[in-house]
Amino acid sequence: MAKKSMIAKAARKPKFSVRGYTRCQICGRPHSVYRDFGICRVCLRKMANEGLIPGLKKASW
């Protein structure tokens, strides 16, 4: 889980637009966030395995 201070800091508009970054909407993780879903890879995998994301399933070949 991300620190609450870092989540609050990321929510503010940065002085320069290039300094903005995405965070996971569920856990607040700053790295490996999928833009299409707005969540990180950890939460994406967990939710996909539980069947909470429609149209997404684990690949098997």
Swiss-Prot record:
Disulfide bonds: none
Cofactor(s) needed: Zn(2+)
Gene3D superfamilies per the UniProt record, alphabetical: 30s Ribosomal Protein S14, Chain N
Sites where the protein binds Zn(2+): 24, 27, 40, 43
GO molecular function list: rRNA binding; structural constituent of ribosome; zinc ion binding
Annotated cofactor note: Binds 1 zinc ion per subunit.
InterPro entries, per the entry: Ribosomal_uS14, Ribosomal_uS14_bact, Ribosomal_uS14_CS, Ribosomal_uS14_sf
GO cellular component: cytoplasm; small ribosomal subunit
A Pfam family annotated for this UniProt entry: Ribosomal_S14
Assembly and binders: Part of the 30S ribosomal subunit. Contacts proteins S3 and S10.
Family: Belongs to the universal ribosomal protein uS14 family. Zinc-binding uS14 subfamily.
Biological role stated in the UniProt entry: Binds 16S rRNA, required for the assembly of 30S particles and may also be responsible for determining the conformation of the 16S rRNA at the A site.
Stated name of the protein: Small ribosomal subunit protein uS14
Organism this protein belongs to: Campylobacter lari (strain RM2100 / D67 / ATCC BAA-1060)
